[in-house]
Regions:
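Residues that define the transmembrane beta-barrel architecture of outer-membrane proteins
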Residues: 36, 76-80, 126-132, 155, ...
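Residues on the lipid-exposed face of transmembrane beta-strands in outer-membrane beta-barrel proteins
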Residues: 42, 82-90, 96, 134-140, ...
Length: 260
C-alpha cells in the first residue's frame, strides 16, 4: 500500500508542476530560492526511553494501591511512515503522516511489595498497528543560517495481547548552518507520550489477573544533531540522531519534492 501511495504522488507531480498555487504570498521571500511546494517522503524513526507510571491497578483481593516509585519501565518504539507535505506559505509547511508502528514496553514489577507467594516479575507489553497524525513547521532562514520549529500530533490504532492506546505530541526545534546543498543543524525533541494498556496477565498460583496501567514519558526532552542533503531540487534526505536524559532517538527521511 505504501508503494502505491508513493507512486500515485509521483505520477501526480507533472500536473502539480504545471500550475501550483503554493506557496501563497511567495513574494515576501524576495529573490530567495524556495523549495518545491509539495513533498512525499518516507520516515524511519526509533525511540528508546523510560516511563513514569501515572497509575497501576491489579484486580486482586486485598490489594489496594501500588507504590509505583519502585517500578522501572523501559519502552522501545520503531516507526515507519509516509509523509505528505505542502509549503502553504514561504515560512509555513503543513503535513500529514500515515504508517506503521511497533513497540515493546517492559514494566519491572519484581520490587512491588504485594502479599503474593512469588514476585510479579516483568510485565512485557508488545504492540503494533497503524499510526496517523499531522503537524506543521515554521521556518526562517538567512543566507547561511536557518531556524525552525515543528509540532506533530500522532495517534496509534494498535493490536496486541492487550487493549492499548498510545498518543504523542512532539516539538522539534532546530537551528543550523546552510552550505550549498548541505545543512548541518542542532536541535532536540520534546516528546510527551501517553500509553494506556488494559488486559490480564497470568500469575503463578493466581491464574489470570486483570490489570490497568497508564504510562508517561519520564524525561520529555533530549538534544539532537543532524544533517540534511539536497541531491537535486526534487530529492532530499535528512539524518538526525539524539540522546541524553535517558532517551535515544534516530530519524532518517527521504523526500521527493515537486510542483512550483
Amino acid at each position: 500500500m505504501k508503494k502505491c501511495l508513493i507512486l500515485a504522488a509521483l505520477l501526480a507531480a507533472p500536473a502539480a508542476q504545471a500550475d501550483s498555487p503554493f506557496p501563497l504570498m511567495r513574494d515576501i521571500a524576495g529573490d530567495r530560492e524556495l523549495p518545491r511546494p509539495y513533498g512525499v517522503g518516507i520516515d524511519f524513526f526509533t525511540l528508546d526511553q523510560g516511563y513514569d507510571i501515572d497509575s497501576l491497578a491489579f484486580s486482586l483481593p486485598g490489594v489496594g494501591g501500588v507504590d509505583t516509585d519502585v517500578i522501572d519501565v523501559d519502552n522501545n518504539v520503531r516507526e515507519s511512515d509516509i509523509k505528505f507535505d505542502v509549503w502553504v506559505l514561504p515560512f509555513l509547511n503543513v503535513f500529514g503522516i500515515f504508517g506503521h508502528v511497533s513497540g515493546d514496553t517492559a514494566v519491572d514489577l519484581s520490587a512491588v511489595p504485594l502479599p503474593l507467594p512469588v514476585p510479579l516479575g516483568t510485565l512485557d507489553i508488545e504492540y503494533s498497528g497503524q499510526v496517523f497524525g499531522g503537524g506543521a513547521t515554521l521556518a526562517f532562514a538567512g543566507e547561511h543560517w536557518f531556524t525552525s520549529l515543528t509540532g506533530t500530533y500522532t495517534k496509534s490504532d494498535l493490536s496486541g495481547d492487550f487493549d492499548s492506546d498510545v498518543k504523542s505530541v512532539t516539538w522539534q526545534p532546530r537551528v543550523g548552518y546552510l552550505n550549498g546543498p548541505w545543512v548541518f543543524f542542532a536541535g532536540g525533541y520534546y516528546i510527551d507520550t501517553e500509553e494506556k494498556h488494559q488486559g490480564a496477565i497470568a500469575l503463578p498460583g493466581l491464574g489470570s489477573v486483570p490489570f490497568d496501567v497508564t504510562l508517561q514519558s519520564n524525561s520529555k526532552f533530549n538534544p539532537s544533531l543532524g544533517v540534511y542533503y539536497r541531491f537535486t531540487d526534487h530529492a532530499e534526505t535528512t539524518l538526525e540522531l539524539g540522546g541524553g536524559n535517558g532517551r535515544q532517538t534516530t530519524l532518517l527521511n527521504f523526500t521527493w519534492r515537486f510542483g512550483g
